[in-house]
């Protein structure tokens, strides 16, 4: 399985960055099966199994206990990077973005853009108000696979779904407009699980472009990790490599450290605040507490400091 990034790289849902979307869907499937689930994504498990990555299919279907993928750094309760907390992590993240979209559309926004949509099935599972148009933007192979798989499941969108099959490194605003997007109307944007897979300068360009395409009253939700303190970056890489090694023992060969872009970058919240967005932010620890979940252990990934941000463009 190819992991190392290079300029112009592409992927499907079983390779490189694409397989992280399948991992996320596996976690949503696990969260949906929880005793007191915070989310309900009935499409997550069948989509993961349709992709066909064995380890992720077993996690999604409950045949493999994610605790078997923990390592000695994860602590008794589990740190944010522990596989045993994977379902909890994805439950609070998914609920955060679900509620963001439902609140935005309840406030009258009828135009939604999901960037790097992956195996996101919100266009099929959320109770969208009548007249809502949901644009899904992702690589052509990803869009085509999900559309076909959901059709084979007999699923029907609960909003008007428009697909924009384009790489975010290409002229995606033109493709979005060609699909009917109207930049003069307020939009609800999500950049979920995306920013860390962009080089720092590309992250800024993406946020700038969202701002340029946003009419006043538009809303945006995203999440971002803090910049590592001096000396922490190598520890983080080592931790990610250790996690990848545990996966390899179960037949899943993916180097997570090779997929993300390290280095100093503008943190999303202050950057957006400086470009006309009025923002609110919470940490993932706040979301765990608000949803009655056991607190996360500390570890050297700083995942517990992940910041979830939403705001309105003024």
Curated annotation (Swiss-Prot):
Top-level enzyme category: transferase
Record: residues binding S-adenosyl-L-methionine: 138, 167-168
EC numbers, comma separated: 2.1.1.-
One Gene Ontology MF term: methyltransferase activity
Listed Gene3D superfamilies: Vaccinia Virus protein VP39 (3.40.50.150)
UniProt entry keywords in alphabetical sequence: Methyltransferase, S-adenosyl-L-methionine, Transferase
Gene Ontology terms: biological process: methylation
The family this protein is said to belong to: Belongs to the UPF0677 family.
Job of this protein: Exhibits S-adenosyl-L-methionine-dependent methyltransferase activity.
Protein name: Putative S-adenosyl-L-methionine-dependent methyltransferase MAV_4441
Biological source species: Mycobacterium avium (strain 104)
């Amino acid at each position: 399985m190819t992991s190392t990034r290079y300029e112009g790289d592409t992927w499907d849902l079983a390779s490189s960055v694409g397989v992280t979307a399948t991992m996320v869907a596996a976690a949503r499937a696990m969260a949906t099966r929880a005793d007191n689930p915070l989310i309900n994504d009935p499409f997550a498990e069948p989509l993961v199994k349709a992709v066909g990555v064995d380890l992720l299919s077993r996690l999604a279907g409950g045949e493999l206990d994610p605790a078997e993928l923990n390592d000695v750094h994860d602590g008794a309760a589990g740190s944010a990077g522990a596989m045993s907390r994977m379902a909890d992590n994805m439950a609070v993240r998914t609920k955060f973005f679900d509620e963001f979209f439902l609140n935005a559309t309840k406030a009258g926004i009828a135009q939604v853009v999901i960037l790097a949509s992956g195996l996101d099935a919100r266009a099929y599972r959320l109770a969208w108000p009548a007249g809502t148009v949901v644009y899904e933007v992702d690589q052509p192979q990803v869009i085509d696979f999900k559309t076909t798989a959901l059709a084979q499941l007999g699923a029907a969108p609960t909003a008007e779904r428009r697909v924009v099959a384009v790489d975010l490194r290409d002229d995606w605003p033109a493709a979005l407009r060609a699909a009917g997007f109207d930049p003069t109307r307020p939009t609800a944007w999500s950049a979920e699980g995306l920013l860390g897979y962009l080089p720092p300068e590309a992250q800024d360009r993406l946020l700038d472009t969202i701002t340029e395409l946003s009419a006043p009253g538009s809303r945006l939700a995203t999440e971002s990790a803090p910049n590592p303190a001096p000396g922490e970056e190598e520890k983080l890489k080592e931790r990610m490599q250790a996690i990848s090694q545990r996966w390899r023992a179960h037949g899943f060969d993916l180097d997570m450290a090779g997929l993300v872009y390290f280095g100093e970058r503008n943190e999303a919240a202050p950057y957006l605040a400086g470009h006309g967005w009025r923002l609110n932010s919470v940490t993932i620890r706040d979301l765990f507490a608000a949803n009655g979940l056991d607190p996360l252990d500390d570890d050297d990934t700083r995942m517990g400091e992940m910041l979830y941000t939403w705001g309105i463009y003024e």
